[in-house]
């Protein structure tokens, strides 16, 4: 908006306002007096441009976006802690609050028999399943303590894009009066939930089915499903949660759909077939994260594009998804999971 308010243009305007009979050449007293003022004014216009970017919700960032969102009753979602299962010596009672250590992470034993990471964010999602836990407390009879699978993934603090999207949903009144968007919003408010789909009237009048993934876009655990159910509709049809009276809510997890990829590939000179396979696997995994619960079609053209853009691939042919050279259509509740990647090396 103030792009034309440069040092040079400000200086020219000030010099033009001075009488012609006064020496205002570069190096003169009046020129040297005005130059620092013009520089400071130019900086002020730059700051004014920045201020305008920060006060409007479509361009605001950080704490300024927080303040706009607060006006609509929305707060940035704080980082959440990972919750994992644990395996302990049979018959031993683990006191609630007992602390355990593994791989630079500390966990506390909770009342529901799970392990909660003390560090908020994605740290507790580390690949430590099956490792031995070191007990930091004296627990009689405890001989085995093993950290197991993730039940509720930890999540980093909400980023600006996510907060902005929730803000626009609220101010545009897209989620109101228990419509589909409202049920989706309620489910997403539960810590650990990733993406959500809502199916109204799935089993007759007054019924609503909510299907969720966890924050890692994987099938949700029973604990996470229970949390969503208790938040939205703890007593079916009674209006004790977020859902209105007369609404009977069912919460289910998304399910995996295993996807196999095969191709014939000619590697680049000095590239191995293992390098090719790693690059293709990485590209397909990124694609699956992008389309999970957003697009229910895995397109052959997308896989072709991944193989074509792999740095170690010179040429390729015969790409297939689950054994056929055509698009793979997922059901409404399926999320893709990469299975076998079969790469056959072509000869030169």
Swiss-Prot record:
| Pfam families associated with the record | Baseplate_J
Its family?
A: Belongs to the Mu gp47/PBSX XkdT family.
PANTHER family (UniProt xref): PHAGE-LIKE ELEMENT PBSX PROTEIN XKDT, PROTEIN JAYE-RELATED
Q: What is this protein called?
A: Uncharacterized protein YqbT
């Amino acid at each position: 908006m103030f792009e034309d308010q440069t040092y040079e243009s400000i200086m020219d305007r000030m010099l033009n306002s001075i009488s012609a009979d006064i020496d205002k050449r570069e190096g003169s007293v009046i020129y040297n007096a005005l130059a620092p003022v013009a520089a400071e004014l130019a900086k002020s216009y730059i700051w004014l441009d920045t201020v305008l970017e920060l006060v409007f919700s479509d361009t605001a960032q950080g704490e300024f976006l927080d303040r706009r969102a607060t006006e609509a009753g929305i707060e940035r979602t704080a980082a959440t802690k990972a919750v994992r299962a644990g395996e302990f010596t049979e018959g031993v009672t683990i006191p609630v609050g007992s602390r355990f250590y593994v791989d630079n992470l500390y966990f506390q034993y909770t009342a529901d028999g799970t392990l909660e990471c003390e560090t908020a964010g994605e740290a507790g999602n580390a690949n430590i399943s099956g490792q031995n836990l070191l007990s930091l407390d004296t627990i009689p009879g405890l001989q085995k303590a093993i950290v197991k699978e993730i039940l509720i993934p930890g999540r980093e603090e909400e980023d600006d894009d996510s907060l902005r999207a929730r803000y626009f949903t609220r101010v545009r009144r897209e989620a109101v009066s228990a419509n589909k968007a409202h049920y989706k919003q309620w489910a997403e408010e539960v810590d650990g939930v990733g993406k959500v789909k809502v199916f109204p009237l799935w089993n007759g009048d007054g019924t609503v089915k909510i299907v969720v993934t966890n924050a890692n876009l994987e099938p949700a655990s029973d604990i996470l499903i229970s949390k969503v159910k208790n938040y939205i509709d703890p007593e079916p049809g009674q209006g004790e949660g977020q859902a209105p009276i007369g609404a009977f809510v069912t919460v289910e997890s998304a399910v995996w759909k295993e996807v196999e990829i095969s191709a014939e590939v000619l590697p680049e000179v000095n590239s191995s077939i293992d390098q090719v396979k790693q690059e293709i696997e990485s590209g397909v995994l990124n694609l699956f994260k992008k389309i999970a619960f957003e697009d229910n079609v895995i397109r052959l053209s997308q896989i072709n594009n991944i193989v074509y853009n792999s740095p170690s691939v010179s040429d390729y042919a015969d790409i297939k998804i689950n054994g056929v050279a055509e698009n793979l259509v997922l059901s409404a509740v399926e999320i893709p999971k990469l299975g076998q990647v079969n790469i056959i090396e072509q000869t030169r």
